[in-house]
UniProtKB/Swiss-Prot annotation:
The protein's role, per its UniProt record: Sequence-specific endonuclease that cleaves unmethylated GATC sequences. It is involved in DNA mismatch repair.
Keyword Ion transport: no
Keywords on record: Cytoplasm, DNA damage, DNA repair, Endonuclease, Hydrolase, Nuclease
TM regions (residue ranges): none
Protein's organism: Escherichia coli (strain SMS-3-5 / SECEC)
Protein name, as recorded: DNA mismatch repair protein MutH
Pfam families in the cross-refs: MutH (PF02976)
Family: Belongs to the MutH family.
Main location: cytoplasm
GO molecular function (one): DNA binding
Example of a GO biological process term: DNA modification
Amino acid sequence: MSQPRPLLSPPETEEQLLAQAQQLSGYTLGELAALAGLVTPENLKRDKGWIGVLLEIWLGASAGSKPEQDFAALGVELKTIPVDSLGRPLETTFVCVAPLTGNSGVTWETSHVRHKLKRVLWIPVEGERSIPLAQRRVGSPLLWSPNEEEDRQLREDWEELMDMIVLGQVERITARHGEYLQIRPKAANAKALTEAIGVRGERILTLPRGFYLKKNFTSALLARHFLIQ
């Protein structure tokens, strides 16, 4: 079997993207890094986004950290998801930064969260810490769009969380708010503050927040797909 090669330009169709992702299934991160001419770090402590960057290289992703989807021409977002030996997610999934100001008139339909989750290429990767990073294998990809029920679940959580932000309650939001979608602080250090709305409508400084999918959402999504296959 010939070895796969990284895509040198963004894929032109979903079929091409999925076919490339399927070729990576079963390879270890160390093998894929070596084939792409990269060095595999010993762990992810200083290179938290390394797996995502590696797979972006292999799949010809274009967006980098820009707000559009990773495969902007196709409207597809790439999400790597660390899983245990049973294929269950090991952590929550970052979606996008939560806007803390300028939210008047924003609806679920026009929200950044919905835009990012409209079409997602999920790639499970072995994530148990007992497996050295270079030996962790890439799993079967899933090209997914939310069904009606999933869209409703996400919408309800998003509306609840955005109401709290708009009403000046951002500091009261905990990871427990939202059944499937949560908001958590997202900052490398506690000094990186951003503007938000306070209880009396005043401007306050607070930690940047991010939207994350909870494990119960991604777990059900992956289980349903891989039982069907």
